[in-house]
């Protein structure tokens, strides 16, 4: 969950998000070191009174500023490619959910069950109860079991949408007529909030996403109740 005036990422709730945060810190440190070096060189050049008018070229300097950036780019690219493949890998999901974007709500269908599906609308401000978050709460949450591979099939009924939950490190475009997929494993129980992340019309800001992760036995109880109500 995000906090007021927060500058960093939300707490990671999935292994992929933990990897993304580590990669961000790794890249940020490289950028910080390069910026410090450049600032030092500029300061030294501006403050010194020494000049050397006899150096017209330097083979050694050209070798260094060619090889060093290449090494730095490799140090960034290798972990980046690793995470890219991790995010795209979907092996033996325990549960598949189809998320459909509409103007302006989400509908969910649990494809492993025959009649388990529902629409998820934002709760209006006047209907909120104490402790609920404005513009983030929905009347039906997407409930999933924790510590289980979950596959989400994402599409849209009308215009472009995007299904995104920052704490899980997930963002997938919802394109009409096209079925995209993403996957995640939630590490701990909790309620995780997201929003449509593709401008989709007048009420784009009012189609939140709420994912609730519960132990497997609680999920089975919830799914049984939902099937009875269907």
Swiss-Prot record:
<dbReference type="GO" id="GO:0005743">
    <property type="term" value="C:mitochondrial inner membrane"/>
</dbReference>
<feature type="binding site">
    <location>
        <position position="196"/>
    </location>
    <ligand>
        <name>Cu cation A2</name>
    </ligand>
</feature>
<feature type="binding site">
    <location>
        <position position="204"/>
    </location>
    <ligand>
        <name>Cu cation A2</name>
    </ligand>
</feature>
<dbReference type="GO" id="GO:0005507">
    <property type="term" value="F:copper ion binding"/>
</dbReference>
<dbReference type="GO" id="GO:0004129">
    <property type="term" value="F:cytochrome-c oxidase activity"/>
</dbReference>
<keyword id="KW-0472">Membrane</keyword>
<feature type="binding site">
    <location>
        <position position="200"/>
    </location>
    <ligand>
        <name>Cu cation A2</name>
    </ligand>
</feature>
<keyword id="KW-0813">Transport</keyword>
<comment type="similarity">
    <text>Belongs to the cytochrome c oxidase subunit 2 family.</text>
</comment>
<keyword id="KW-0999">Mitochondrion inner membrane</keyword>
<comment type="subunit">
    <text>Component of the cytochrome c oxidase (complex IV, CIV), a multisubunit enzyme composed of 14 subunits. The complex is composed of a catalytic core of 3 subunits MT-CO1, MT-CO2 and MT-CO3, encoded in the mitochondrial DNA, and 11 supernumerary subunits COX4I, COX5A, COX5B, COX6A, COX6B, COX6C, COX7A, COX7B, COX7C, COX8 and NDUFA4, which are encoded in the nuclear genome.</text>
</comment>
<keyword id="KW-1133">Transmembrane helix</keyword>
<protein>
    <recommendedName>
        <fullName>Cytochrome c oxidase subunit 2</fullName>
        <ecNumber>7.1.1.9</ecNumber>
    </recommendedName>
</protein>
<keyword id="KW-0186">Copper</keyword>
<dbReference type="InterPro" id="IPR036257">
    <property type="entry name" value="Cyt_c_oxidase_su2_TM_sf"/>
</dbReference>
<dbReference type="Pfam" id="PF00116">
    <property type="entry name" value="COX2"/>
</dbReference>
<dbReference type="GO" id="GO:0042773">
    <property type="term" value="P:ATP synthesis coupled electron transport"/>
</dbReference>
<feature type="binding site">
    <location>
        <position position="196"/>
    </location>
    <ligand>
        <name>Cu cation A1</name>
    </ligand>
</feature>
<dbReference type="InterPro" id="IPR001505">
    <property type="entry name" value="Copper_CuA"/>
</dbReference>
<feature type="transmembrane region" description="Helical; Name=I">
    <location>
        <begin position="15"/>
        <end position="45"/>
    </location>
</feature>
<dbReference type="GO" id="GO:0045277">
    <property type="term" value="C:respiratory chain complex IV"/>
</dbReference>
<keyword id="KW-0496">Mitochondrion</keyword>
<feature type="transmembrane region" description="Helical; Name=II">
    <location>
        <begin position="60"/>
        <end position="87"/>
    </location>
</feature>
<comment type="function">
    <text>Component of the cytochrome c oxidase, the last enzyme in the mitochondrial electron transport chain which drives oxidative phosphorylation. The respiratory chain contains 3 multisubunit complexes succinate dehydrogenase (complex II, CII), ubiquinol-cytochrome c oxidoreductase (cytochrome b-c1 complex, complex III, CIII) and cytochrome c oxidase (complex IV, CIV), that cooperate to transfer electrons derived from NADH and succinate to molecular oxygen, creating an electrochemical gradient over the inner membrane that drives transmembrane transport and the ATP synthase.</text>
</comment>
<dbReference type="InterPro" id="IPR008972">
    <property type="entry name" value="Cupredoxin"/>
</dbReference>
<dbReference type="InterPro" id="IPR011759">
    <property type="entry name" value="Cyt_c_oxidase_su2_TM_dom"/>
</dbReference>
<keyword id="KW-1278">Translocase</keyword>
<keyword id="KW-0479">Metal-binding</keyword>
<dbReference type="InterPro" id="IPR034210">
    <property type="entry name" value="CcO_II_C"/>
</dbReference>
<dbReference type="InterPro" id="IPR002429">
    <property type="entry name" value="CcO_II-like_C"/>
</dbReference>
<dbReference type="Pfam" id="PF02790">
    <property type="entry name" value="COX2_TM"/>
</dbReference>
<keyword id="KW-0812">Transmembrane</keyword>
<feature type="topological domain" description="Mitochondrial intermembrane">
    <location>
        <begin position="1"/>
        <end position="14"/>
    </location>
</feature>
<feature type="binding site">
    <location>
        <position position="161"/>
    </location>
    <ligand>
        <name>Cu cation A1</name>
    </ligand>
</feature>
<feature type="binding site">
    <location>
        <position position="198"/>
    </location>
    <ligand>
        <name>Cu cation A2</name>
    </ligand>
</feature>
<keyword id="KW-0249">Electron transport</keyword>
<dbReference type="InterPro" id="IPR014222">
    <property type="entry name" value="Cyt_c_oxidase_su2"/>
</dbReference>
<feature type="topological domain" description="Mitochondrial intermembrane">
    <location>
        <begin position="88"/>
        <end position="230"/>
    </location>
</feature>
<keyword id="KW-0460">Magnesium</keyword>
<feature type="binding site">
    <location>
        <position position="198"/>
    </location>
    <ligand>
        <name>Mg(2+)</name>
    </ligand>
</feature>
<keyword id="KW-0679">Respiratory chain</keyword>
<feature type="binding site">
    <location>
        <position position="200"/>
    </location>
    <ligand>
        <name>Cu cation A1</name>
    </ligand>
</feature>
